[in-house]
Amino acid sequence: MDTVTQQRISKLHPTVREEMVKIINSCNQALQGKAQVRITQGLRTIDEQNKLYALGRTEKGKKVTQAKGGQSIHNYGFAVDICLIIDGKTASWDTAKDWDNDQIADWMECVKIFAQHGWVWGGSWLKFKDMPHFEKKNLTWKQLAKLKLDTSGYVKL
């Protein structure tokens, strides 16, 4: 697991950090070395979320989210976006490529592993497909927004 991913895991909600380490390690083991998972986004501030929401609306760019600040699972530390790092150099979001030649798309191997741990893939959503996105199952931003925060700023479950 690379340093960037480790740093991003360390900022996720404390209740999912250990699980995320297991997920990433399982993905990397399944991918057999050529491709490795990198978390490109984890915990996101309300301000960062609002800036992303502005893209394609009030700011130039393509829409990348349907969620305003506070309305994303990222804002609570229960979501990650990933890419695959190929040969330690190149970032890829190709969901069909099979770099380890095991007849299963590497991205889909990761989707399966995340699902086994109770995480939902944004690529399975019907309206707004978010291919790099995974979030903890059975949590909604509306539920999370009502919870009190601990001294570190994370919601108390």
Model-derived features: positions:
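Cell-envelope/glycan interface and biosynthesis
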Residues: 1-140, 150, 154-156
